[in-house]
């Protein structure tokens, strides 16, 4: 099941989300928009299990990474209307 993984430009390039992901959905890619000169990327969203460990690991005040669960997961969790 695929979930949407969004990475925002508030990413500081710390790699915490990449290390927290149990399914290797994330990787770091070069980016000049932050001091670390890298940003998280999500090239394998089809492997995302929706655990949101990446969100939990993010140290920025506004989460730089968000996982939006697919409709099937939301329904199975009783969150759908």
Curated annotation (Swiss-Prot):
Uppermost EC category: oxidoreductase
Keyword terms: 4Fe-4S, Electron transport, Iron, Iron-sulfur, Membrane, Metal-binding, Oxidoreductase, Photosynthesis, Photosystem I, Repeat, Thylakoid, Transport
Main location: membrane
Catalytic activity: reduced [plastocyanin] + hnu + oxidized [2Fe-2S]-[ferredoxin] = oxidized [plastocyanin] + reduced [2Fe-2S]-[ferredoxin]
GO terms, molecular function: 4 iron, 4 sulfur cluster binding; electron transfer activity; metal ion binding; oxidoreductase activity
Residues covered by the 4Fe-4S ferredoxin-type domain: 2-31, 39-68
Membrane topology note: Peripheral membrane protein
Record: residues binding [4Fe-4S] cluster 1: 11, 14, 17, 58
UniProt xrefs under Pfam families: Fer4_7
Presence of the UniProt keyword Methyltransferase in the record: no
Binding site for [4Fe-4S] cluster 2: 21, 48, 51, 54
Transmembrane segments: none
EC number per UniProt: 1.97.1.12
Cofactor(s) this protein requires: [4Fe-4S] cluster
Biological function: Apoprotein for the two 4Fe-4S centers FA and FB of photosystem I (PSI); essential for photochemical activity. FB is the terminal electron acceptor of PSI, donating electrons to ferredoxin. The C-terminus interacts with PsaA/B/D and helps assemble the protein into the PSI complex. Required for binding of PsaD and PsaE to PSI. PSI is a plastocyanin/cytochrome c6-ferredoxin oxidoreductase, converting photonic excitation into a charge separation, which transfers an electron from the donor P700 chlorophyll pair to the spectroscopically characterized acceptors A0, A1, FX, FA and FB in turn.
Subunit architecture: The cyanobacterial PSI reaction center is composed of one copy each of PsaA,B,C,D,E,F,I,J,K,L,M and X, and forms trimeric complexes.
HAMAP family for this protein: PSI_PsaC (MF_01303)
Protein's name in the database: Photosystem I iron-sulfur center
Organism of provenance: Microchaete diplosiphon (Fremyella diplosiphon)
